[in-house]
Amino acid sequence: MTQQTQQPEVNIGLVGHVDHGKTTLVQALSGSWTDQHSEEMKRGISIRLGYADATFRMISNINPPEGYTVDETGPDGEPTETLRTVSFVDAPGHETLMATMLSGAAIMDGAVLVVSATEDVPQAQTEEHLMALDIIGIENVVIAQNKIDLVDRERAIESHNQIQSFVEGTVAEDAPIVPVSAQQAVNIDLLIDAIEREIPTPERDADTSPRLYAARSFDINRPGTTWKNLSGGVIGGSVSRGRLETGAEIELRPGREVDQGGQVEWQPIITDVRSLQAGGESVSEVTPGGLCGVGTGLDPSLTKGDSLAGQIVGEPGTLPPTRESFTMTVELLDRVVGDEAGEVETISTGEPLMLTVGTATTVGAVTSARSGEAEVSLKRPVCAEEGSKIAINRRVGARWRLIGIGTLE
């Protein structure tokens, strides 16, 4: 298998309510591909990113959908044909982690909405995640009706009908609903078939200057490592365009906070690419699509604990501006999604909002609010270009709730 085939080429989000089986489904789809390459970097990414790569394959003498598999050999021991490798982004289903799901959505090309057949539809986060996909504009959706092994036929049909009426009028209205059991690996072939049809690999420009969205960052050194053996900090994310190569000089924006004689300002970080990982392999270059790990020359204390998540990475001098405030056009939802479902009131001056721009989440205070427009001053700046989509969350009770979408002017 060539390195090119092995590299993931598309990012698929797994979204849905907590405990509906997203992580178990990832395990079923990853098949016999386990941690064969347990290098430190990959260990770090898979722990932090909540992601797994899966290679979809075809058994040559069996027609689809039954011929789809994730196994390297068919029933008679014959090798299977590789179709493509995909990266699954496992978005947290817990409501307090909604910001993480939104920042993950920035690097998704499509999504599998996982809904448990054992519970009524919709549960709170199922609804909130679907609304987030709608808002961010992820149109390629497949629905996995999970845990069918735990219900009888009548309940499975009732659940299917509930899902159908729930997605009516949303981005997932025409999405196929595939009944599966992640635990028993039932109908995984049908799910792969639906993903292959509904979530194609998008066309991307690999010949322009590279752009990577950082979704995670970490220190891969074990406690007690001597300074001679220290590895540089690692960034995990997705290349949206161009090629990233080992040895390349890179810039990170908005960078880091620096105290300049009592004045705090944000300065870009310049470093170099020391190593790259994609599809579980060390590679010399990463092309768009899929998730990758970038080993850098940065002090690992700068990258530990996701402290560089939300940065944009590229060639020095090619990145969008760093913004400490911006104006956005605002489109509000009709109602607040979640438990305290109520009408969304207009945004008012002085109110705090949680904003997700790309993979960056920040809090901003509204300095001016007009009809369909708001100016915000950010607590932590973002690097973003005009036209970027912004997920807007408001504090409702003790929680942040999704209330609308902004477009950066």
From Swiss-Prot:
<feature type="binding site">
    <location>
        <position position="23"/>
    </location>
    <ligand>
        <name>Mg(2+) 1</name>
    </ligand>
</feature>
<feature type="binding site">
    <location>
        <begin position="146"/>
        <end position="149"/>
    </location>
    <ligand>
        <name>GTP</name>
    </ligand>
</feature>
<dbReference type="GO" id="GO:0001731">
    <property type="term" value="P:formation of translation preinitiation complex"/>
</dbReference>
<comment type="similarity">
    <text>Belongs to the TRAFAC class translation factor GTPase superfamily. Classic translation factor GTPase family. EIF2G subfamily.</text>
</comment>
<dbReference type="InterPro" id="IPR050543">
    <property type="entry name" value="eIF2G"/>
</dbReference>
<dbReference type="GO" id="GO:0003743">
    <property type="term" value="F:translation initiation factor activity"/>
</dbReference>
<keyword id="KW-0547">Nucleotide-binding</keyword>
<feature type="domain" description="tr-type G">
    <location>
        <begin position="7"/>
        <end position="203"/>
    </location>
</feature>
<keyword id="KW-0378">Hydrolase</keyword>
<dbReference type="InterPro" id="IPR044128">
    <property type="entry name" value="eIF2g_GTP-bd"/>
</dbReference>
<protein>
    <recommendedName>
        <fullName>Translation initiation factor 2 subunit gamma</fullName>
        <ecNumber>3.6.5.3</ecNumber>
    </recommendedName>
</protein>
<dbReference type="Pfam" id="PF03144">
    <property type="entry name" value="GTP_EFTU_D2"/>
</dbReference>
<feature type="binding site">
    <location>
        <position position="46"/>
    </location>
    <ligand>
        <name>Mg(2+) 1</name>
    </ligand>
</feature>
<comment type="function">
    <text>eIF-2 functions in the early steps of protein synthesis by forming a ternary complex with GTP and initiator tRNA.</text>
</comment>
<comment type="subunit">
    <text>Heterotrimer composed of an alpha, a beta and a gamma chain.</text>
</comment>
<dbReference type="GO" id="GO:0000049">
    <property type="term" value="F:tRNA binding"/>
</dbReference>
<feature type="region of interest" description="G3">
    <location>
        <begin position="90"/>
        <end position="93"/>
    </location>
</feature>
<keyword id="KW-0396">Initiation factor</keyword>
<keyword id="KW-0648">Protein biosynthesis</keyword>
<dbReference type="InterPro" id="IPR000795">
    <property type="entry name" value="T_Tr_GTP-bd_dom"/>
</dbReference>
<dbReference type="InterPro" id="IPR009000">
    <property type="entry name" value="Transl_B-barrel_sf"/>
</dbReference>
<feature type="binding site">
    <location>
        <begin position="181"/>
        <end position="183"/>
    </location>
    <ligand>
        <name>GTP</name>
    </ligand>
</feature>
<feature type="region of interest" description="G4">
    <location>
        <begin position="146"/>
        <end position="149"/>
    </location>
</feature>
<dbReference type="GO" id="GO:0005525">
    <property type="term" value="F:GTP binding"/>
</dbReference>
<feature type="region of interest" description="G5">
    <location>
        <begin position="181"/>
        <end position="183"/>
    </location>
</feature>
<feature type="binding site">
    <location>
        <position position="19"/>
    </location>
    <ligand>
        <name>Mg(2+) 2</name>
    </ligand>
</feature>
<keyword id="KW-0342">GTP-binding</keyword>
<dbReference type="GO" id="GO:0003924">
    <property type="term" value="F:GTPase activity"/>
</dbReference>
<feature type="binding site">
    <location>
        <begin position="19"/>
        <end position="24"/>
    </location>
    <ligand>
        <name>GTP</name>
    </ligand>
</feature>
<dbReference type="InterPro" id="IPR004161">
    <property type="entry name" value="EFTu-like_2"/>
</dbReference>
<feature type="region of interest" description="G2">
    <location>
        <begin position="44"/>
        <end position="48"/>
    </location>
</feature>
<dbReference type="Pfam" id="PF09173">
    <property type="entry name" value="eIF2_C"/>
</dbReference>
<dbReference type="InterPro" id="IPR027417">
    <property type="entry name" value="P-loop_NTPase"/>
</dbReference>
<dbReference type="InterPro" id="IPR009001">
    <property type="entry name" value="Transl_elong_EF1A/Init_IF2_C"/>
</dbReference>
<dbReference type="GO" id="GO:0005829">
    <property type="term" value="C:cytosol"/>
</dbReference>
<dbReference type="InterPro" id="IPR022424">
    <property type="entry name" value="TIF2_gsu"/>
</dbReference>
<dbReference type="GO" id="GO:0046872">
    <property type="term" value="F:metal ion binding"/>
</dbReference>
<feature type="binding site">
    <location>
        <position position="44"/>
    </location>
    <ligand>
        <name>Mg(2+) 2</name>
    </ligand>
</feature>
<dbReference type="InterPro" id="IPR005225">
    <property type="entry name" value="Small_GTP-bd"/>
</dbReference>
<feature type="region of interest" description="G1">
    <location>
        <begin position="16"/>
        <end position="23"/>
    </location>
</feature>
<keyword id="KW-0479">Metal-binding</keyword>
<dbReference type="InterPro" id="IPR015256">
    <property type="entry name" value="eIF2g_C"/>
</dbReference>
